[in-house]
Structures are given as C-alpha cells and as structure tokens.
Amino acid sequence: QHEEVYGLKMLDSVVKKWKPTDFKLHVYLEGYDGKSDGLPEADFIEYRHLENIQARTDFITRNSDKNGRFGEAPYNYRMDAVRFCHKVYAMSDLFFELLEQESKDWMVWLDADTITKKMFKAEDAAKILIPEVDIVHLGRIDIDYSETGFIGFNLGMHNACSLLVDLRGAYDTDEVFAYREWTDAFV
C-alpha cells in the first residue's frame, strides 16, 4: 500500500522541514483502527480517520462495485471511484469544518507521497498561494486533467469554495458516474 511506503516519509519530512508555528497539518488516515500509534507527533499535526466520515462510508457501501474492475477486463484506475473518493471526502470534511469557522485562509491538499526537501515557512507558501487567486495546482500539458497531488483552495474566494461543494456533491449524489472517468482529478 502506498501509504505505508510514502506516508511515513512525508510525515517525517514535514516534522523536520516545516516551520511548526506557520502551519497546521490535518492527516487523514485509513485503516488505522482509530489509532495513530507510531506516527510522527508534532503540535501542528492532527490525525483524523477517514472511517469517521459517514458520507464516505455510505459512498463506498453504495458503490463498492465501482472499483476499476469490470469482469475479466484489466484493472482501470480511471474507473475506480472507490479509490479516489478518499481524497474528495478528506478535503471536503476539512473544508466544511473551516467553512463553519468562517476561515478565509488557504486549504492545501498534499498527497502522501509529497516529500519536503528543504525548510518550508509561511513566506515560502505565500509565493505560490497568491491572495488574488482562487485555486493553485500543478497543471499538465499532455493530459486533460491536473495533477492533484498538490492543490490549494483560497477559502476567501467564492469559486474555490464552490468547487469543493460541487466536488463533494458529485460523490454524495453519485453524479461522478456520469463522467467518462471517475478520478478526483478528472471530475
């Protein structure tokens, strides 16, 4: 599982390289049975469990067969809505909490294979999280959707908030299955 290989490396790099007073990291765990034993600890890291998001559980229960496997055909990750729902529900869970708090800050998603190589402070983040911009992401040229291993949402901007609401809605209502691909990046 990628989380076992990349997740711990990411967390170790964050603890060593992020300025603790500048950031708050919310880590969504899957399959840890409600525990976070053995994971790096820091005052700015909060562990949460995907299993506690009821809408995610409902989606998986309703759509367990939408897992990229169709009969004898080879696995197709582009049609694995179950795999890609985790990110959508984690992002939207935190977003709705921040919305209730009337946060106007940036909310940034980082995939578990993101490694911080040098010291990272708020001033560094400010270079890419520009106040006048709704969303920042890693664009691609040769593929028709963005790399979503890094995506930032300016919660002070209506369009960023609307996108998060719409993305969550696409999974809550199963609208995602009207698209030709079911990954979070495509939807």
In which residue ranges do the predicted regions lie?
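A structural signal for well-ordered alpha-helical segments within the folded catalytic domains
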Residues: 5-8, 85-89, 181-186
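Catalytic core and acceptor-binding pocket of nucleotide-sugar-dependent glycosyltransferases
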Residues: 155-187
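Short beta-strand-to-loop element that shapes/binds the nucleotide-sugar donor at the catalytic cleft/hinge
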Residues: 126-155
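Short catalytic/ligand-binding loop motif for oxyanion handling, primarily in non-cytosolic enzymes
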Residues: 5-6, 34-37, 116-119, 124-125, ...
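Residues that flank catalytic or metal-binding motifs in active/ligand-binding sites
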Residues: 87, 110, 146-149, 183
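GT-A fold catalytic core of metal-dependent nucleotide-sugar glycosyltransferases
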Residues: 83-137
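Short acidic-hydrophobic catalytic motif
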Residues: 76
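N-terminal anchoring/stem segment of glycosyltransferases
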Residues: 1-73, 82, 97-103, 155
